[in-house]
């Protein structure tokens, strides 16, 4: 999603920020910086919601080149629902990359497996029963599950908790 690019860029910056500050022994600065990136994510998320709720139809026509009402309706339904969760997606990106900056490689990998399992579950169970509505629900709901997992992993990380030597 084009609207996720600011969050992806911030995530790359956070990864560098976290790793440099870990090397400098600045645990509190890491925590403060990551929390501030979450505020950025929520502001970007609100902006995304406003833009996509106001201009989803026009953007769908512009990107698809089609004026088919069924196609445009499906696109609009998806992007508007996903827009509501765009702040969550930003927090997911920041947290995943902050963990990588801390040197935690396994947890972000587990998060990717959660995403894969969730998508398979939706494809096998929910899409046959609910149709396109399940497709719309799939990614944003998986983002929420992954974000909770990553937040727990970040804030219970031994370095972040202060139980690992700096």
Task: Tell where the protein language model's regions lie, with residue ranges.
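Alpha-helical transmembrane segments of multi-pass membrane proteins
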Residues: 23, 115-118
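Small-residue-rich hydrophobic transmembrane alpha-helices
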Residues: 1-56, 89-111
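Short alpha-helical transmembrane segments in multi-pass integral membrane proteins
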Residues: 18-84, 126-166
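Transmembrane alpha-helical segments of integral membrane proteins
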Residues: 118-127
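Hydrophobic alpha-helical segments typical of transmembrane helices
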Residues: 14, 83, 95, 121-122
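Membrane-embedded alpha-helical transmembrane segments of multi-pass integral membrane proteins
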Residues: 89-92, 118, 146-149
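A short pocket-lining beta-strand/turn micro-motif at the edge of beta-sheets
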Residues: 104-107, 122, 133
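Hydrophobic/small/kink-forming positions within alpha-helical transmembrane segments
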Residues: 9, 50, 116-117, 144
């Amino acid at each position: 999603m084009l609207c996720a690019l600011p969050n992806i860029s911030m995530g790359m910056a956070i990864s560098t920020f976290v790793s440099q500050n870990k090397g400098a022994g600045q645990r509190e600065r890491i925590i403060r910086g990551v929390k501030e990136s979450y505020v950025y994510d929520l502001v970007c998320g609100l902006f995304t919601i406003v833009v996509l709720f106001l201009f989803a139809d026009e953007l769908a026509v512009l990107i698809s080149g089609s004026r088919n009402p069924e196609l445009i309706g499906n696109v609009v339904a998806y992007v508007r629902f996903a827009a509501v969760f765009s702040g969550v997606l930003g927090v997911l990106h920041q947290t995943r990359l902050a963990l990588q900056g801390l040197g935690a490689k396994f947890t972000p990998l587990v998060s990717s497996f959660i995403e894969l399992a969730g998508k398979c579950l939706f494809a096998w169970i929910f899409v046959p029963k609910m149709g396109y509505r399940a497709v719309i629900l799939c990614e944003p709901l998986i983002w929420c599950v992954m974000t909770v997992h990553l937040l727990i992993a970040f804030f219970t990380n031994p370095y972040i908790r202060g139980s690992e030597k700096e």
